[in-house]
Amino acid sequence: MDYSLCELCPRSCGVDRTAGERGFCGCPDTALVAKTMLHRWEEPALAGSGGSGAVFFGGCTLGCRYCQNAAISGGPTGTPVDSEGLRRIFEDLIAQGAENIDLVTPTQFLPTILSALTPKLPVPVVYNCGGYERAETIRQLEGKVDIYLPDLKYADSALGQSLSGAADYFPAACGAIREMVRQTGRPRWNGDKMVRGTIIRHLILPGQVENSLRVLDWIGENFAPGQVLVSLMRQYTPMGGLAAPFDRRVTEDEYEAVLSWMYLNRLEGFTQEAESADAGFIPDFQQGG
């Protein structure tokens, strides 16, 4: 795995980033760190009392039109760091009391990250990604990552294309998530803190209840009860510039319909309050750290 023939994500651009070529994500061959923080808004099983040691990387392999982190994901932004510098960032967050190291949108910089994760850290490593991954890439993370936190955004290929430019999102994400669960097995705990396992996130989109039901159906059909956890999110926040129905928040009826389907599929996990759909919960990427 390297940057010289980049096939880290399903777009498989094949560019030589070491020679200055750029693919879809626009990123160089040096990791870009946009922000670090003790993140207390992750799922309770991850945030604990100390917070997740979140490392937000610049750029993204998806480019969702409604992204809350567009300030950093829309282009290659952040401070360049090599693997040694990234290791120091991890260790500093742990010294501050981080419950884990939360790698946020990391795929485009995996070669650097993998080097920084050796030797193994004394806290769990969380791979927090958009779900648009290659199973072959995820396979190379075995033994390095303890907790996978992928999105499963779309079961509808037209929706994946229109909102993220990825008509192949669903098959790619499904294959990657199967590999994640193969590696982690069922969730493992230390008290109320997860130390190993896979949490599948799904963000309900306005006007797209059917998409959400299909996503939950797939999870229920492919994993035994309790084998994975589901984090059902209602935090969609209109960011401007999108036509209806994406110019509004998710309604209570939409949320309740999806929540009922989650329970019908005997899926365990986490849910959110309506107050989460507020721009105040988006990290401030203009601040230092």
Can you say where each PLM-predicted feature lies in the sequence?
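Anionic-ligand binding region
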Residues: G160-G191
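Aromatic/hydrophobic pocket-lining residues that form the small-molecule binding cavity
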Residues: L86, I113, I138, A173, ...
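A cross-domain feature marking catalytic cores of carbohydrate-active enzymes
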Residues: F57, T105-T107, Y127-G131, L152, ...
